Amino acid sequence: MLRLARFYSLARTKAIHSHGAPFRPEYALKCGLEIHTQLNTKNKLFSQSTNSATSLVDAPNHHTSYYDIALPGTQPVLNLEAILFAMKLSLALGSQVNSISQFDRKHYFYGDQPQGYQLTQHYRPFARGGKINLSKELDDIDESAKEIGILQLQIEQDTGKSHYTETDKDVITLVDLNRSNVPLIELVTKPDFSDIKQVRAFIKKYQNLVRHLHISSGDLETGAMRVDVNLSINEYARVELKNLPNTSSIINAIKYEYQRQVELISVGDTSSLMEPETRGWTGSSTVKLRSKETTIDYRYMPDPELPYINLAPDVISGVRGLMPQLPDDIMRILMKKPYQLSLKDAKILTYNSNQNDMYNHEALRSYYLDTFREFSKLAGERSNAKLPTNWIIHEFLGDLNKLQIPLAKAKEILPPPVFAQFLKLLHEEVISATSGKMLLFHILENFEQSNCQDLSIPDFSKLIEKFELHAINQVDPQELMDLCNDVIAQHTDDTFIRNLVTGKKKSSLKFLIGQGMRRSQGRIKANEFEKKFKEILNIQW
């Protein structure tokens, strides 16, 4: 019986993961999120301990103070940097920052919570309201626009972390308090999500926002950002989903739980959906953790050791005046004239990933904009907006990643005015695109081989002369004919040529053109090769 039940569960999970849960109109999904975000302040929330909760190299219990381990007699001292970070996020979300907020004790007993309570903001949270706007244009959702409302934001302290080790006789629990008392912001959304795309887009946008504001790494994998899901179907009781370590787990858990509840409703077995419950995600299914009857009474009470947080209006307005331009606004500017970037390229300049050590989005965007301005001055009204985009975002970044050169280093030999000069050579067809790629890679490769110590600015004219990279304006017909015949002669397979001539495999023509470009070192343009190959092979399509 157990094997059969397990087989049914795995089969259902496989179907959900393969095809996606069918969100049917008659089973309306209502979903909200609770997101805990660790703040990357210098110190912890109520002590002077170094805030290094997500470090993978530090020894356990290394970043702790007497207060973090709840030594009797120690008292909390509020870290004002956490207040500043919370204010930045609240203003970015359009939330109403409360002039007065307070900390409350949330009582429960657990090994990694040595105080016996957690300091949070239950009665008077830091901010209320706000929203994140999603759109089809920027976020790939089905609706043209979708507003996800924010209920509140509150500041609280993180707990320690329990580690479990099995021995022959028992299971040993080890507690690491490096994470204890790390500042968190808990964001609670309204239950405004109605499908998976909206959830995925919201998490990605919120993650980028906290990185953009420099208040958190936003990494789900390290626990710097943790997401709980609340969902219900057809107004049945709310189910909370926990243990969701990454975006794919969040999405798959929602799909699975939706399908599980739909099956119960469709057969009339709704008794288990009448009361709220908490379920955990195992990686393949959701399992019951606790129900309403076993819900903990946290006995909230105002903390007697911490005064109210009083924020004067001029403090809030002062922080508002220092707020940076937000990612959506930046992307919309980049996608319009004069830049005219695609959404994909605009996101490269706006969305920051902590996994990329070669550059951050702000430095890259600044480099792009400065180069664009310099190139526009040189090229005047005839400037091509696509040149800076293609050569910086695609060719230049590709070379930096391949050679493992940080953007900050590469800027020393190719500052924006110099890169603009390089783009001018391409724009005026002094060199071809193929020659440009060779020239750019050569410059960066030499720089990398000098351990990024040779800071001499490249002399493009000398390099073009040295490697004979000048584009040929007047093509020697005989030279072009010989090059094309040599390329064709390399392909003795009649099928290759026949499929090309008949149009069965048109892509083969691009292959021949590429070989011709390489043989001419990019000096002869691609369209010259295309015309000559079609003439020689009598291609009619």
Swiss-Prot record:
Gene3D superfamilies: 1.10.10.410. One of its GO terms (cellular component) is mitochondrion. GO terms for biological process: glutaminyl-tRNAGln biosynthesis via transamidation; mitochondrial translation. SUPFAM superfamilies: GatB/YqeY motif, Glutamine synthetase/guanido kinase. It is an enzyme of class 6 (ligase). It holds the Pfam family GatB_N. One of its GO terms (molecular function) is ATP binding. NCBIfam families: gatB (TIGR00133), PRK05477.1-2 (NF004012). Subunit of the heterotrimeric GatFAB amidotransferase (AdT) complex, composed of A (HER2), B (PET112) and F (YGR102C) subunits. Belongs to the GatB/GatE family. GatB subfamily. Allows the formation of correctly charged Gln-tRNA(Gln) through the transamidation of misacylated Glu-tRNA(Gln) in the mitochondria. The reaction takes place in the presence of glutamine and ATP through an activated gamma-phospho-Glu-tRNA(Gln). PANTHER family: GLUTAMYL-TRNA GLN AMIDOTRANSFERASE SUBUNIT B MITOCHONDRIAL AND PROKARYOTIC PET112-RELATED, GLUTAMYL-TRNA(GLN) AMIDOTRANSFERASE SUBUNIT B, MITOCHONDRIAL. This is Glutamyl-tRNA(Gln) amidotransferase subunit B, mitochondrial.
